[in-house]
Regions:
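C-terminal segment of classical bacterial N-terminal signal peptides
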Residues: 14-22
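Bacterial N-terminal signal peptides that target proteins for export
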Residues: 1-8
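Small-residue-enriched, tightly packed secondary-structure blocks
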Residues: 24-192
């Protein structure tokens, strides 16, 4: 019985939510946080262009794009993640800083970090993302290759009307793009 209680206590402790990634920024000033997110944005885009050169064409024709750096953990039946990012408009307007949170259920154990890039074909799609945020419900999975489109759209997933998504993992471009109860929203502290 004592061993069972010890194992149960261990399992409960390990399944506690992880501090959000943006909590790591708490000791930094808003200006430092913004600078770090912009640097992270440049690194994500450079990596995307290196792994998928055609993506540059898609971004070049777009109204803008968003990058997010995410960290997630799953232990036993529950998991979650968080991250930060920025929306860059093609018109060189002020960047819009964002946050994301993810909740997932199902058996598994693991820790992952990944980057997500959204490319917005239209101002309408871009403004909707900025002003209303965005949520993936349940288990939304999109194949990361659309053979019919080819070129710039190859290895990107069309996740909404006028919105394309790339997901980068430690191993490169994800073969499948998954969002499990993920919400994207403006960071009110960094957009002041």
């Amino acid at each position: 019985m004592k061993r069972f209680l010890s194992l149960l206590l261990c399992a409960l402790t390990l399944s506690m939510p992880v501090a959000p990634a943006y909590a790591l920024f708490d000791s930094k000033s808003p200006a430092q946080q913004r600078a770090e997110i912009l640097k992270q944005n440049d690194q994500i885009m450079a990596r995307l262009y290196r792994l998928e050169p055609h993506a540059k064409e898609l971004v070049g024709k777009s109204a803008g794009y968003a990058t997010f750096s995410n960290f997630g953990m799953k232990i036993f039946i529950a998991g979650g993640g968080s991250g930060s990012g920025v929306v860059m408009r093609k018109a060189n307007q002020k960047p819009v800083f964002m946050k994301m949170v993810e909740v997932q259920a199902g058996l598994g154990v693991g820790i992952k970090s990944f980057s997500v890039i959204f490319v917005f074909e239209t101002e309408k799609a871009l403004n909707s993302f900025i002003n209303s945020g965005w949520e993936f419900g349940g288990q939304a999975t999109a194949a990361a290759k659309y053979e019919n489109n080819g070129g710039a759209y190859e290895r990107a997933a069309n996740v909404s009307e006028g919105v394309w998504m790339y997901q980068l993992t430690d191993n490169g471009l994800a073969a499948e793009i998954t969002a499990k109860g993920t919400k994207y929203y403006q960071d009110s502290d960094l957009n002041k």
